[in-house]
Protein backbone atom coordinates (compact mmCIF):
# COMPACT_ATOMS: atom_id res chain seq x y z
CA UNK A 1 0.00 0.00 0.00
CA UNK A 2 1.20 3.52 -0.76
CA UNK A 3 2.97 4.87 2.32
CA UNK A 4 1.25 8.23 1.98
CA UNK A 5 -2.14 6.55 2.26
CA UNK A 6 -0.90 4.45 5.17
CA UNK A 7 0.45 7.38 7.15
CA UNK A 8 -1.89 10.19 6.04
CA UNK A 9 0.56 12.57 7.64
CA UNK A 10 -0.96 15.57 9.35
CA UNK A 11 -0.14 18.82 7.61
CA UNK A 12 -2.50 21.39 9.00
CA UNK A 13 -2.57 24.39 11.28
CA UNK A 14 -1.00 23.87 14.68
CA UNK A 15 -2.19 26.96 16.49
CA UNK A 16 -5.64 28.41 16.04
CA UNK A 17 -7.64 30.92 18.01
CA UNK A 18 -10.92 30.08 19.77
CA UNK A 19 -14.06 30.18 17.70
CA UNK A 20 -15.74 33.52 17.42
CA UNK A 21 -19.43 33.83 18.24
CA UNK A 22 -21.24 31.90 15.53
CA UNK A 23 -23.99 33.57 13.56
CA UNK A 24 -26.89 31.44 12.39
CA UNK A 25 -26.44 30.48 8.77
CA UNK A 26 -28.92 32.61 6.89
CA UNK A 27 -29.55 33.81 3.38
CA UNK A 28 -28.65 37.49 2.96
CA UNK A 29 -27.95 40.07 0.25
CA UNK A 30 -31.26 39.46 -1.47
CA UNK A 31 -30.58 35.74 -1.78
CA UNK A 32 -27.11 36.19 -3.27
CA UNK A 33 -25.13 34.90 -0.27
CA UNK A 34 -25.32 32.85 2.91
CA UNK A 35 -23.90 34.24 6.15
CA UNK A 36 -21.91 31.50 7.91
CA UNK A 37 -20.25 33.50 10.69
CA UNK A 38 -20.00 37.14 11.78
CA UNK A 39 -18.94 39.23 8.77
CA UNK A 40 -18.39 36.04 6.73
CA UNK A 41 -20.43 34.96 3.71
CA UNK A 42 -20.45 32.27 1.03
CA UNK A 43 -21.55 32.91 -2.54
CA UNK A 44 -22.43 29.88 -4.67
CA UNK A 45 -22.75 29.66 -8.44
CA UNK A 46 -23.07 26.41 -10.41
CA UNK A 47 -22.12 24.50 -7.28
CA UNK A 48 -18.82 26.35 -6.70
CA UNK A 49 -18.20 28.42 -3.55
CA UNK A 50 -16.49 31.76 -2.94
CA UNK A 51 -15.86 33.16 0.54
CA UNK A 52 -16.40 36.84 1.36
CA UNK A 53 -15.24 38.50 4.57
CA UNK A 54 -16.74 41.97 4.87
CA UNK A 55 -15.13 43.86 7.74
CA UNK A 56 -15.14 47.56 8.55
CA UNK A 57 -11.56 47.56 7.21
CA UNK A 58 -12.66 46.26 3.81
CA UNK A 59 -13.37 42.98 2.07
CA UNK A 60 -11.40 39.77 1.62
CA UNK A 61 -12.39 37.33 -1.16
CA UNK A 62 -11.21 33.71 -1.30
CA UNK A 63 -11.70 30.83 -3.73
CA UNK A 64 -11.51 29.89 -7.38
CA UNK A 65 -12.23 33.10 -9.31
CA UNK A 66 -14.63 31.76 -11.95
CA UNK A 67 -16.16 34.72 -13.83
CA UNK A 68 -19.79 33.86 -13.03
CA UNK A 69 -18.92 33.42 -9.36
CA UNK A 70 -17.00 36.69 -9.25
CA UNK A 71 -19.90 38.53 -10.89
CA UNK A 72 -22.32 37.18 -8.30
CA UNK A 73 -19.91 38.07 -5.50
CA UNK A 74 -19.78 41.67 -6.71
CA UNK A 75 -23.57 41.86 -6.69
CA UNK A 76 -23.66 40.38 -3.20
CA UNK A 77 -21.09 42.86 -1.90
CA UNK A 78 -23.07 45.73 -3.37
CA UNK A 79 -26.23 44.44 -1.67
CA UNK A 80 -24.34 44.17 1.62
CA UNK A 81 -23.06 47.76 1.20
CA UNK A 82 -19.57 46.39 1.79
CA UNK A 83 -16.40 48.41 1.43
CA UNK A 84 -13.72 47.92 -1.21
CA UNK A 85 -12.11 44.53 -1.77
CA UNK A 86 -8.62 44.74 -0.31
CA UNK A 87 -7.40 41.16 -0.70
CA UNK A 88 -8.18 38.34 -3.14
CA UNK A 89 -6.90 34.93 -2.01
CA UNK A 90 -6.80 32.86 -5.18
CA UNK A 91 -7.33 29.10 -4.99
CA UNK A 92 -6.69 26.44 -7.62
CA UNK A 93 -9.40 24.53 -9.41
CA UNK A 94 -10.69 23.82 -12.92
CA UNK A 95 -10.01 26.87 -15.11
CA UNK A 96 -8.20 28.81 -12.38
CA UNK A 97 -5.08 29.43 -14.47
CA UNK A 98 -7.14 31.41 -16.98
CA UNK A 99 -9.21 33.25 -14.38
CA UNK A 100 -6.20 35.30 -13.27
CA UNK A 101 -6.90 37.48 -10.26
CA UNK A 102 -10.62 37.58 -10.95
CA UNK A 103 -10.37 41.23 -11.94
CA UNK A 104 -9.93 42.34 -8.33
CA UNK A 105 -6.47 43.79 -8.96
CA UNK A 106 -7.69 46.49 -11.33
CA UNK A 107 -10.13 47.53 -8.60
CA UNK A 108 -7.32 48.10 -6.13
CA UNK A 109 -7.11 44.75 -4.34
CA UNK A 110 -3.92 42.82 -3.64
CA UNK A 111 -4.27 39.36 -5.17
CA UNK A 112 -2.12 36.47 -4.02
CA UNK A 113 -1.83 32.80 -4.94
CA UNK A 114 0.29 29.77 -4.11
CA UNK A 115 3.37 30.05 -6.31
CA UNK A 116 2.56 27.08 -8.56
CA UNK A 117 -0.85 28.52 -9.39
CA UNK A 118 0.66 31.97 -9.87
CA UNK A 119 3.20 30.44 -12.26
CA UNK A 120 0.47 28.82 -14.34
CA UNK A 121 -1.48 32.08 -14.44
CA UNK A 122 1.64 33.89 -15.62
CA UNK A 123 2.20 31.23 -18.30
CA UNK A 124 -1.40 31.55 -19.48
CA UNK A 125 -1.02 35.34 -19.69
CA UNK A 126 1.86 34.85 -22.14
CA UNK A 127 0.22 32.13 -24.23
CA UNK A 128 -2.12 33.29 -27.02
CA UNK A 129 -3.91 29.93 -27.06
CA UNK A 130 -4.91 30.24 -23.38
CA UNK A 131 -5.42 33.95 -22.68
CA UNK A 132 -6.58 35.20 -19.31
CA UNK A 133 -10.20 36.20 -18.88
CA UNK A 134 -10.65 39.81 -19.99
CA UNK A 135 -10.02 42.33 -17.22
CA UNK A 136 -7.90 39.99 -15.13
CA UNK A 137 -4.16 39.89 -14.53
CA UNK A 138 -1.40 37.89 -12.89
CA UNK A 139 -1.72 38.12 -9.07
CA UNK A 140 0.65 40.61 -7.51
CA UNK A 141 1.92 38.22 -4.84
CA UNK A 142 2.77 34.55 -4.47
CA UNK A 143 3.70 32.34 -1.53
CA UNK A 144 5.35 28.94 -1.24
CA UNK A 145 4.14 27.38 2.03
CA UNK A 146 2.19 29.83 4.17
CA UNK A 147 1.02 33.43 4.22
CA UNK A 148 -1.02 35.31 6.82
CA UNK A 149 -3.27 38.18 5.85
CA UNK A 150 -4.58 40.54 8.54
CA UNK A 151 -7.54 42.77 7.73
CA UNK A 152 -9.41 44.46 10.53
CA UNK A 153 -10.75 41.80 12.89
CA UNK A 154 -10.03 38.93 10.49
CA UNK A 155 -6.78 37.06 9.98
CA UNK A 156 -6.60 34.50 7.18
CA UNK A 157 -3.95 31.79 7.23
CA UNK A 158 -3.26 30.32 3.78
CA UNK A 159 -1.31 27.07 4.11
CA UNK A 160 0.06 24.89 1.31
CA UNK A 161 -1.33 21.35 1.43
CA UNK A 162 -0.18 18.05 -0.11
CA UNK A 163 -0.70 17.99 -3.87
CA UNK A 164 -4.36 17.10 -4.34
CA UNK A 165 -6.37 18.84 -7.06
CA UNK A 166 -2.99 20.09 -8.28
CA UNK A 167 0.43 20.95 -6.94
CA UNK A 168 -0.97 24.29 -5.73
CA UNK A 169 -3.48 23.02 -3.18
CA UNK A 170 -3.98 25.22 -0.14
CA UNK A 171 -6.29 25.60 2.83
CA UNK A 172 -7.47 28.88 4.30
CA UNK A 173 -8.43 29.22 7.94
CA UNK A 174 -10.29 32.41 8.79
CA UNK A 175 -9.36 32.77 12.44
CA UNK A 176 -11.79 35.52 13.32
CA UNK A 177 -14.75 33.69 11.82
CA UNK A 178 -13.56 30.22 12.77
CA UNK A 179 -14.26 28.66 9.37
CA UNK A 180 -12.10 26.64 6.99
CA UNK A 181 -11.93 26.62 3.18
CA UNK A 182 -10.46 23.55 1.42
CA UNK A 183 -9.96 23.72 -2.34
CA UNK A 184 -9.64 19.93 -2.78
CA UNK A 185 -12.78 19.09 -0.77
CA UNK A 186 -16.07 18.59 -2.62
CA UNK A 187 -19.46 17.79 -1.12
CA UNK A 188 -21.44 17.39 -4.35
CA UNK A 189 -19.50 14.44 -5.77
CA UNK A 190 -16.07 13.08 -6.55
CA UNK A 191 -13.25 15.65 -6.48
CA UNK A 192 -11.41 16.97 -9.51
CA UNK A 193 -7.79 15.81 -9.73
CA UNK A 194 -5.46 17.31 -12.33
CA UNK A 195 -2.58 14.83 -12.35
CA UNK A 196 -0.76 16.71 -15.13
CA UNK A 197 -0.72 19.81 -12.91
CA UNK A 198 0.87 17.85 -10.06
CA UNK A 199 -2.31 16.63 -8.39
CA UNK A 200 -2.90 13.23 -6.86
CA UNK A 201 -5.56 11.26 -5.02
CA UNK A 202 -3.26 10.51 -2.08
CA UNK A 203 -2.77 14.24 -1.45
CA UNK A 204 -6.52 14.92 -1.32
CA UNK A 205 -6.87 12.11 1.22
CA UNK A 206 -3.90 13.35 3.28
CA UNK A 207 -5.34 16.84 3.58
CA UNK A 208 -8.77 15.58 4.63
CA UNK A 209 -7.24 13.14 7.13
CA UNK A 210 -5.05 15.83 8.67
CA UNK A 211 -7.96 18.10 9.52
CA UNK A 212 -10.16 15.21 10.66
CA UNK A 213 -7.41 14.02 13.02
CA UNK A 214 -6.18 17.38 14.29
CA UNK A 215 -9.63 18.82 15.02
CA UNK A 216 -11.57 15.74 16.10
CA UNK A 217 -11.75 17.11 19.66
CA UNK A 218 -12.53 20.69 18.64
CA UNK A 219 -14.55 20.63 15.40
CA UNK A 220 -16.10 24.01 16.20
CA UNK A 221 -12.73 25.63 15.45
CA UNK A 222 -13.08 24.88 11.73
CA UNK A 223 -16.81 24.39 11.19
CA UNK A 224 -18.51 25.06 8.97
CA UNK A 225 -16.01 23.70 6.48
CA UNK A 226 -16.42 25.38 3.11
CA UNK A 227 -15.67 23.01 0.22
CA UNK A 228 -14.70 24.07 -3.28
CA UNK A 229 -18.02 22.63 -4.45
CA UNK A 230 -21.23 21.73 -2.70
CA UNK A 231 -22.91 22.47 0.61
CA UNK A 232 -21.18 23.54 3.80
CA UNK A 233 -19.85 20.60 5.77
CA UNK A 234 -19.03 19.25 9.21
CA UNK A 235 -15.88 17.41 10.25
CA UNK A 236 -17.93 14.21 10.18
CA UNK A 237 -18.71 14.76 6.51
CA UNK A 238 -15.05 15.49 5.82
CA UNK A 239 -14.24 12.16 7.49
CA UNK A 240 -16.73 10.39 5.19
CA UNK A 241 -15.03 12.04 2.21
CA UNK A 242 -11.60 10.91 3.44
CA UNK A 243 -12.75 7.33 4.00
CA UNK A 244 -14.09 7.17 0.45
CA UNK A 245 -10.82 8.46 -0.99
CA UNK A 246 -8.71 5.96 0.93
CA UNK A 247 -10.93 3.04 -0.07
CA UNK A 248 -10.88 4.00 -3.75
CA UNK A 249 -7.11 4.47 -3.70
CA UNK A 250 -6.59 1.02 -2.19
CA UNK A 251 -8.92 -0.63 -4.71
CA UNK A 252 -7.31 1.07 -7.68
CA UNK A 253 -3.84 0.36 -6.34
CA UNK A 254 -4.68 -3.35 -6.22
CA UNK A 255 -5.91 -3.23 -9.82
CA UNK A 256 -2.63 -1.61 -10.87
CA UNK A 257 -0.66 -4.28 -8.98
CA UNK A 258 -2.72 -6.93 -10.78
CA UNK A 259 -1.56 -5.49 -14.10
CA UNK A 260 -4.91 -4.05 -15.15
CA UNK A 261 -4.98 -1.31 -17.77
CA UNK A 262 -6.82 1.91 -17.06
CA UNK A 263 -9.76 0.76 -19.20
CA UNK A 264 -9.89 -2.50 -17.29
CA UNK A 265 -9.78 -0.58 -14.02
CA UNK A 266 -12.74 1.51 -15.15
CA UNK A 267 -14.62 -1.66 -16.14
CA UNK A 268 -13.97 -3.14 -12.67
CA UNK A 269 -15.97 -0.26 -11.13
CA UNK A 270 -13.88 0.28 -7.99
CA UNK A 271 -16.15 3.16 -6.98
CA UNK A 272 -19.40 1.19 -7.29
CA UNK A 273 -20.15 1.21 -3.56
CA UNK A 274 -19.74 5.00 -3.45
CA UNK A 275 -21.42 6.07 -6.68
CA UNK A 276 -24.86 6.60 -5.15
CA UNK A 277 -23.41 9.24 -2.81
CA UNK A 278 -20.48 10.65 -4.77
CA UNK A 279 -21.10 9.76 -8.42
CA UNK A 280 -23.77 12.31 -9.28
CA UNK A 281 -21.68 15.45 -9.40
CA UNK A 282 -19.72 17.07 -12.24
CA UNK A 283 -16.96 14.43 -12.00
CA UNK A 284 -18.26 11.09 -13.28
CA UNK A 285 -17.17 7.78 -11.70
CA UNK A 286 -15.22 6.93 -14.87
CA UNK A 287 -13.38 10.24 -14.86
CA UNK A 288 -12.56 9.85 -11.17
CA UNK A 289 -11.26 6.30 -11.64
CA UNK A 290 -9.06 7.41 -14.53
CA UNK A 291 -7.59 10.18 -12.37
CA UNK A 292 -7.14 7.75 -9.48
CA UNK A 293 -5.39 5.26 -11.77
CA UNK A 294 -3.01 7.94 -13.05
CA UNK A 295 -2.36 9.03 -9.45
CA UNK A 296 -1.51 5.50 -8.32
CA UNK A 297 0.79 4.90 -11.29
CA UNK A 298 2.60 8.18 -10.62
CA UNK A 299 2.98 7.36 -6.93
CA UNK A 300 4.37 3.90 -7.68
CA UNK A 301 6.85 5.34 -10.17
CA UNK A 302 7.98 7.92 -7.62
CA UNK A 303 8.37 5.24 -4.95
CA UNK A 304 10.40 3.04 -7.32
CA UNK A 305 12.65 5.99 -8.14
CA UNK A 306 13.24 6.68 -4.43
CA UNK A 307 14.12 3.06 -3.79
CA UNK A 308 16.46 3.08 -6.78
CA UNK A 309 18.26 6.13 -5.45
CA UNK A 310 18.56 4.47 -2.05
CA UNK A 311 20.19 1.40 -3.56
CA UNK A 312 22.64 3.53 -5.53
CA UNK A 313 24.20 5.03 -2.38
Which residues does each PLM region occupy?
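N-terminal export leaders
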Residues: 3-7
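Active-site HxH/HxHxD metal-binding segment of metal-dependent hydrolases
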Residues: 78-148
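Metallo-beta-lactamase
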Residues: 24, 35, 58-60, 65-68, 117-247, ...
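Conserved beta-strand hairpin/beta-sheet module of binuclear metal-dependent hydrolase folds
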Residues: 31-77, 170-174, 178-184
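Bacterial N-terminal signal peptides
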Residues: 9-18
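Accessory terminal helices/loops
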Residues: 216-222, 231-313
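Sec/Tat signal peptide C-region and signal peptidase I cleavage site
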Residues: 19-23
